[in-house]
Regions:
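Nucleic-acid endo/exonuclease domains
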Residues: 2-155
């Protein structure tokens, strides 16, 4: 049998067993895309006349997907959930399987930081929006960044 010289080093994390039927339903309902905060932000961006791609890789060779991408301006937007990404204001600590969730959130934060670094290195502007942020305020921030970036990219 022949094996590739490159070997995947990504560790598979064992999913925790839900502590209750309610927890099980909550875990099943968690979506990787098209969340309510994402939809609200996209709606506001669209009202301002901004056009974008959703759930795409900004850099094809990079195995990371952004929630919203403005290709011509080289701007990526990630809408981070307070629980999943450890929001300092609204992030909550899980009571059941606490150690698993602490590690999971730390890994998410490390991946977020690495993603930011890799995209910046590739010439992209990275914007992170917490799910609790006002879609209107986030839209204004993103609009200003897109305008500035388009001016830089199209010089």
């Amino acid at each position: 049998m022949h094996y590739s010289a490159t070997k995947r080093t990504t560790k598979k994390i064992q999913k925790p067993i839900p502590s209750s039927k309610t927890a099980s339903n909550r875990m099943k309902a968690a979506k990787p895309r098209d969340t309510a905060p994402e939809k609200a932000l996209r709606s506001e961006l669209h009202k301002k006349g901004l056009r974008y791609r959703i759930d795409v890789r900004p850099v094809e060779t990079l195995n990371r997907r952004a929630d919203i991408v403005f290709r011509s301006a080289k701007v990526t937007v990630f809408v981070d959930g307070c629980f999943w990404h450890g929001c300092p204001k609204h992030g909550t600590q899980a009571k059941a399987n606490a150690e698993f969730w602490r590690n999971k959130i730390k890994q998410n934060q490390a991946r977020d930081a690495e993603t930011n670094q890799l995209l910046k290195k590739a010439g992209w502007k990275v914007v992170r929006v917490w799910e609790h942020e006002s879609p209107g305020k986030a839209t204004e921030k993103i609009l200003n960044i897109v305008i500035k970036q388009k001016a830089k990219v199209h010089k």
